[in-house]
Amino acid sequence: MSRLTTIQSDNATGQTAELFSAIKRAMGKVPNAYQTIGNAPDVLAQALQHNATLAKSSLSKRELEAINLAVSEASGCDYCLAAHTLTGKMAGYSVEQTEQLRRADYPEDAHIDGLVKFVKALVTTRGTLPEESVTRFRDAGFSDRQVVETISAVSAILFTNMINRVNDTVVDFPKVN
């Protein structure tokens, strides 16, 4: 049971209603996470803009979904794991591959493996990474720009992880183990 108010689309007003309308057009529904974040419409707008900015970054959709899965696993966010297993499959990953990404162990692609290992280390050390972590990330083919974009992507998914953990958001995506 959610701890915070989950604003139903039919009950949304003002900026929240406008944002929900845009989300529904893009996704076909307004997920429970966004219905919760809608309690603070400016924050919802910022979160959506952050994701739109990341979509225009030099990181691919597959890379962004790998980040989302690895970080959500490290954070223990069942809601985001369910949502991003689905969107990870839409980005071309198999169920088995999404499980590997969650474990930050993706042996079939050194580039993606370097990415998920970097973000897991970033989250588990709270950003206090040894120099060799950054060097390994660069050696996996990532630029300084992508270091910054990756940290931005981590911050975006950590926000939704924390909202959903605090709220105990009801999962409205296919559940995963």
Task: Give the predicted meaning of each segment.
Residues 1-177:
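Hydrophobic alpha-helical segments
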